[in-house]
A protein has these predicted regions:
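Intrinsically disordered, low-complexity and often Lys/Arg-enriched segments
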Residues: 1-39, 469
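Hydrophobic alpha-helical membrane-insertion signals
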Residues: 23-62
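Basic, short loop/linker segments at the boundary and entry of helix-turn-helix/winged-helix-like folds
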Residues: 57-100, 105
């Protein structure tokens, strides 16, 4: 009773002060007038603001705009020389800026980029009121892959001249990235032979049946009536048979090249060294060799989530700034053949050799160690995996023995541990933060070009963070 009486007194007081800016006990007077900031979406602006005022000072879009403006874009403009006003494409500098910003912020699809050009403020500022279609964006990216590789080199060289990147230690690593192809669109060589034979038999049976139908129709209607259209079921089988035959030929050509590199010749039969016969004829792949119908240049590789059609993307990263100074891409799952080419590209870009090279056990090899020693580069490369410790070095491999002794010291172990903190965060940032796990272009050359765009965008974003720090 006492509580109910108190509530009635509070409600009476609230009615008496309604419309005033007061509190009544635990009640808030919800119908009191409140002044809000004005909001008129349909109000036209007499003097519209500059688009640059839509973004805060120091925004990544402004940094990328200034960076692209400082680059030599002659390679990008070259394909348009002589077009005049007959065909007016979008400004290549604007297209480069938009693509770099898109990749730096995790947008890789040309359709999504085109949609962001209409909906995202930063994209509208970069494009300056231009709205290229998704097909235009995709064609521009594909047409200028070589130019983007040159721009990557320019950006690293600018960082070198500015003193951001110095000739010190490089950490090297690779990562398997999905190709623009499904592993379910691949077929083994053994199944190709079986499937090709089956399809040829079905085609022969269908042709026999079609000829019998033609003879019957000629007898019924006369030989002048057209009836030469290819049956749909026969056409489908012929197309599939041709596709399988082409894939089978690619596998055989690939195997023949591998056999030549191993010293075999087409006329050696199956007689090997020491009269030990080869397991197969020259140029004949094993039954489990596979080819993909969608992207024949991609390969089945083992990843952390299983086996898939992939390419192997490689990077060399500067120790002090985590700037990518060299890139590579291959369709070979093994890393050991990629270290020296990466070092060569880094030397060409930076104008000198690094002092140290840090890499995991996938890059080990006596020949590689000897080459690095001859070039005055100190290697800190693991000789074994965590689950498979390193075996004692072969006594004949003197460079490997010296590296093992170096890694056994406290200094060597500390230097090698730095590898994880230098290169692995960069790959993790590309795959986890940006979300780049799958190529959007098919073929090794095009995938390599897109990998250069990704690494260029990562470097530009890294420069932006270093500048803001």
């Amino acid at each position: 009773m006492r509580t109910a009486a108190r509530r009635r007194r509070v409600e009476k007081f609230a009615r008496s002060v309604r419309g005033r800016n007061v509190w009544a006990g635990w009640y808030v007077l919800r119908d009191m007038p409140t002044t809000f900031r004005p909001c008129a979406p349909d109000q036209a602006l007499l003097f519209p603001p500059s688009p640059r005022e839509w973004l805060p000072e120091g925004h990544l879009a402004f940094f990328i705009t200034d960076t692209v403006a400082a680059l030599d874009l002659q390679a990008v403009y070259a394909p348009y020389d002589g077009d005049g006003r007959r065909n007016q494409p979008f400004d290549p500098q604007m297209m480069v800026t938009v693509l770099l910003y898109a990749y730096a912020t995790g947008t890789f699809s040309s359709r999504r980029i085109a949609r962001k050009l209409e909906e995202d403020v930063a994209y509208r500022v970069l494009a300056a009121g231009n709205f290229p279609a998704h097909r235009t964006i995709a064609e521009f990216r594909q047409q200028h892959l070589a130019a983007f590789e040159a721009l990557f080199v320019q950006v690293v060289q600018i960082a070198r001249e500015a003193g951001v990147v110095k000739l010190g230690a490089l950490a090297v690593d690779g990562s398997k990235l999905k190709a623009n192809a499904s592993k379910h669109k691949a077929m083994s060589y053994g199944r190709m032979r079986t499937e090709e034979q089956r399809l040829r038999e079905e085609i022969a049976a269908l042709l026999t049946e079609a000829n019998a139908v033609d003879v019957a129709e000629d007898a019924a209607h006369g030989p002048e009536v057209r009836g030469d259209e290819l049956p749909a079921e026969l056409q489908r089988r012929e197309e599939r048979c041709a596709t399988i035959a082409a894939a089978k030929a690619r596998l055989e050509a690939r195997q023949a090249e591998e056999d030549r590199q191993k010293g075999r010749t087409p006329d050696d039969g199956r007689k090997g060294r020491g009269h030990k016969p080869f397991a197969r004829d020259f140029g004949v792949p094993p039954d489990d060799a596979q080819d993909n119908f969608t992207d024949p240049e991609s390969r089945i590789m083992k990843t952390s989530y299983g086996f898939d059609q992939c390419y192997n993307g490689q990077i060399a990263v500067d120790e002090t700034t985590q700037i990518i100074v060299a890139t590579g891409l291959t369709n070979c799952a093994a890393d050991n053949a990629e270290l020296l080419p990466l070092i060569d590209r880094a030397e060409t870009t930076l104008g000198g050799a690094p002092t140290d090279v840090l890499a995991d056990a996938g890059y080990r090899g006596e020949g590689t160690f000897q080459t690095l020693e001859a070039r005055g580069i100190t290697a800190y490369i693991s000789l074994g995996h965590e689950v498979r410790p390193a075996k004692p070095p072969n006594p004949a491999h003197v460079a490997t023995q010296r590296l093992a002794a170096r890694l056994a010291s406290d200094t060597g172990r500390a230097r090698y541990r730095r590898r994880k903190a230098i290169v692995e965060p960069v790959l993790g940032w590309i795959k986890e933060v940006l979300g780049f796990r799958r190529f959007h272009l098919r073929g090794e050359a095009k995938a390599r070009g897109e990998w250069n765009i990704v690494c260029l965008a990562v470097n530009v974003k890294r420069f932006h963070r270093l500048q803001a720090a």
